[in-house]
């Protein structure tokens, strides 16, 4: 075990040697653990980190994410923001997507929307990028027209769309995001978000999860 840990520390040293780190204070830690996500979360909690960055690989669509189980555990349970990165250029004046959920009136969803937008805007200042709001909303239940013959699916869909438009517009006004940077589409989030990411050629997607955090969430 000690030999493997020493080998990993040497690998980190070799990796850092490729970069100019003279002006940075870098602490290196190699931990032996059979559940990597727990070791990472313990480190975050111990040092009160505000951002966790991890490499990953992503296919052209969110439907075929190549995230590992560790990635998913960290997204759901890490007590800080998680940045999953892949090989991608970071151009000036790029696009950042803030994926929000405008269909819920619940306070915890509203707070999460605001945190997502705040993180996106903070990153936009660092990267000299523009922020776009993206939201996916569901279609009318398929069986409802059968169970309730007088139910007007078109009227329901139009009203639902307008509700999401109004809620997104309110977020746009609150955070100074113009109408042309507000995007809404009917469908599943895992379909809608990557479609807009491709359409906008986005460099970064900011999204959130509702759930417990920390080791107790495992």
What are these regions (language model features)?
Residues 2, 17-52, 173-205, 212-215:
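Structural beta-alpha unit
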Residues 4-15, 119, 159-167, 192:
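Short, solvent-exposed amphipathic alpha-helices that sit
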Residues 72, 118-121, 169:
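Active-site phosphate/pyrophosphate- and oxyanion-stabilizing loops and adjacent acidic/basic residues
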